[in-house]
């Protein structure tokens, strides 16, 4: 049983987050180890394993990047934890330029405003790539979706770096 089946959801990138959450809470209640306190040791162990499976599946499905990676893995394309280098030099150049721009924000005349504008630009880029990966997955364009997910991971890392700069500026 795959993660989507576990939650009674269609195996697709786009999903209803509130339905996922409610299914998660329902499964948590049903398979909570406390419910099996008087059961046999084997049944208690199975309940603990099922609860762990539910938690792992939920963590994967609730995040767009890990959900896309999971869908790709289901199709035999494993990119989770891979060390493959990005093959798109234009994208890599853009990422380097964005990181340089982020480094220069602290020295700007209005760093908070500059960071807000920069964050908006990167968030827009992230949303565009998410929309593209959804289309690619829906159309079974697995290699294209895998490349897009790799790019999304770069952008997500940049978003985390923005948060660190924001913490420094406001901290």
What does each of the following model-derived ranges do?
Residues 1-171:
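C-terminal accessory/regulatory regions appended to core domains
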């Amino acid at each position: 049983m795959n993660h989507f089946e576990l939650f009674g959801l269609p195996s697709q990138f786009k999903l209803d987050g509130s339905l996922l959450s409610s299914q998660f809470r329902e499964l948590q209640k049903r398979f909570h180890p406390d419910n099996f306190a008087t059961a046999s040791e084997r049944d208690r162990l199975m309940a603990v394993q099922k609860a762990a499976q539910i938690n792992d599946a939920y963590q994967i499905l609730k995040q767009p990047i890990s959900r896309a990676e999971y869908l790709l893995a289901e199709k035999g394309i494993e990119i989770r934890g891979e060390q493959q280098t990005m093959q798109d030099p234009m994208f890599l150049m853009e990422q380097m330029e964005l990181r340089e721009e982020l480094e220069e924000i602290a020295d700007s005349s209005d760093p908070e405003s500059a960071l807000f504008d920069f964050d908006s630009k990167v968030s827009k880029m992230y949303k565009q790539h998410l929309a593209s990966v959804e289309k690619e997955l829906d159309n079974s364009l697995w290699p294209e979706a895998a490349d897009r997910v790799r790019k999304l991971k770069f952008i997500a890392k940049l978003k985390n770096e923005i948060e660190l700069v924001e913490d420094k500026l406001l901290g």
